[in-house]
Amino acid sequence: MTDMRRLGQRAKQASLLIAPLSTQIKNRFLSTLAKALVDDTQTLLAANQKDLANAKEHGISDIMMDRLRLTSERIKAIAQGVQQVADLADPIGQVIKGYTNLDGLKILQKRVPLGVIAMIFESRPNVSVDAFSLAFKTNNAIILRGGKDALYSNKALVKLIRQSLEESGITPDAVQLVEDPSHAVAEELMQATDYVDVLIPRGGAKLIQTVKEKAKVPVIETGVGNVHIYVDAQADLDMATKIVINAKTKRPSVCNAAEGLVIHEAVAARFIPMLEKAINQVQPVEWRADDKALPLFEQAVPAKAEDFETEFLDYIMSVKVVSSLEEAISWINQHTSHHSEAIITRDTKAAETFQDLVDAAAVYVNASTRFTDGFVFGLGAEIGISTQKIHARGPMGLEALTSTKFYINGDGHIRE
């Protein structure tokens, strides 16, 4: 069983050792790591094959296997993400504001590291590297606890990172992997208040809920994507068709994929047959439709109440027909996971109202929700997509992994 106390102590010590690292040293190391990832592709693929074989043995679906799979191209993309982080401006030490107060004290507010970040995540091995690169660039140490399905891949990736750190003269404890997949050890990490400054869970609804219930350390909630697309009365239906097909079928296993379709009744009778025909040519979808939508499909099943709350991560989509923009907004706000939502419309006023009133981290007009991604937003590899409002919201890049500190300089000042 993993000794979490010892691991936490090492992480805390490492956070102090890497806190003074300069931008130049950090960027040089990240560039070295990006190259090492590509150079070590075959070793990483061999480790990943063990995870894939185990997953197949346990009957994991093809869609979930895709989340787990590494390929040469995906490793190259991970390396590019690391290099992009190296190329980004360093927020550490950035002066947010500076002034002299009425007492003559010189006050600066600067960005500083959080300290030790813990990350609990599922399936995707790329998260190990993405999370490390962002944590390292912001002078934070990181503890990674991945799912048991990606254990071999995560071990190989973290081993490579630690070797690269050591070869560069930097403490390898800047990154540590919890290899014990037990729930007991995960809960220990959630409660490690002496060592962990913030915990970021990244995974399905069950994981997020467990962390919310059991964590004693501060948590930034991420991930679950019950994402909707609303097709308005004034929508371009050709555009809507293309966007829904992209958002639902391109990669259904990711959190920015659409799960719910909301349609204005004025266009439902035209749009549903049009969409069904077009999507069947790409990838058939199981429609779970409400009473108004059901008779408009050639093939659909009646929706149950829980279907409107579910992140399917599959070729399944709930469908709701509404009578107004106001009803669409109300419905979405009732069922959203506060991740990403979209409206398809040519009505500028409706678009503005939707963006202002829908309670989500990213709200789109006439675009696929699949764009909610730190890399796409220019933040580099993201550590997660926050669905809460405090500290960080939406794709979390470098600034989300910093805090601020006030630096006050005086000359014998005392307060009367």
Swiss-Prot record:
Primary gene name: proA
Catalytic activity annotation: L-glutamate 5-semialdehyde + phosphate + NADP(+) = L-glutamyl 5-phosphate + NADPH + H(+)
Organism: Streptococcus pyogenes serotype M3 (strain ATCC BAA-595 / MGAS315)
Keywords per UniProt: Amino-acid biosynthesis, Cytoplasm, NADP, Oxidoreductase, Proline biosynthesis
Protein name (record): Gamma-glutamyl phosphate reductase
Claim: Glycoprotein is one of the keywords in the record: no
InterPro entries: Ald_DH/histidinol_DH (IPR016161), Ald_DH_C (IPR016163), Ald_DH_N (IPR016162), Aldehyde_DH_dom (IPR015590), G-glutamylP_reductase_CS (IPR020593), Glu-5-SA_DH (IPR012134), GPR_dom (IPR000965)
Pathway participation: Amino-acid biosynthesis; L-proline biosynthesis; L-glutamate 5-semialdehyde from L-glutamate: step 2/2
A Pfam family recorded for this sequence: Aldedh
Biological role: Catalyzes the NADPH-dependent reduction of L-glutamate 5-phosphate into L-glutamate 5-semialdehyde and phosphate. The product spontaneously undergoes cyclization to form 1-pyrroline-5-carboxylate.
UniProt entry tagged with the keyword Amino-acid biosynthesis: yes
